[in-house]
């Protein structure tokens, strides 16, 4: 029997007008005040090239584009930050690695948001990248 405990992260969903805000519950004590480990996704679909990369102490974001103008975006955020989903989009709750995850789609995009218990991760892309987006948690690695 292990004497260690994994932190439990519960989420609160608040509806405000046309959006739903999702954030860690009030009882969650953040493990980080800044991003200490940067993550990236690998195995980007063929034809996509790096378009931009932004990084600061609270989040980072990488965007790839292909010749058709389709985009694929990966971001990492502190778990203490919240995010919002427009209520007009179809949102499904999933479970990834024992944590709640949120998958939503619109007319021409798909987005998956999940956590590892320390950070939020989001993969967003145009509809042609939907298959990759659903498998994104299996392509995440720590950046060297």
Q: Which ranges hold each PLM region?
A:
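Compositionally biased, low-hydrophobicity segments enriched in charged and small polar residues
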Residues: 1, 39-42, 139-140
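Short, solvent-exposed recognition patches
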Residues: 27-111, 115-116, 120
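Functionally constrained cores in energy, signaling, and assembly domains
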Residues: 15, 76, 135-137
């Amino acid at each position: 029997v292990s004497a260690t405990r994994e932190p439990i992260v519960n989420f609160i969903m608040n509806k405000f007008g046309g959006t739903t805000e999702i954030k860690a519950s009030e009882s969650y004590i953040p493990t980080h005040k800044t991003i200490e480990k940067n993550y990236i996704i690998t195995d980007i679909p063929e034809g996509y090239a790096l378009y931009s990369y932004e990084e600061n102490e609270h989040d980072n974001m990488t965007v790839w584009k292909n010749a058709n103008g389709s985009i694929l975006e990966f971001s990492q955020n502190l778990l203490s930050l919240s995010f919002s989903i427009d209520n007009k989009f179809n949102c499904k709750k999933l479970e990834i690695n024992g944590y709640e995850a949120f998958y939503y789609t619109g007319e021409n995009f798909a987005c998956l948001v999940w956590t590892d218990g320390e950070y939020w991760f989001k993969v967003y892309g145009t509809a042609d990248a939907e298959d990759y987006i659903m498998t994104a948690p299996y392509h995440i690695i720590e950046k060297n």
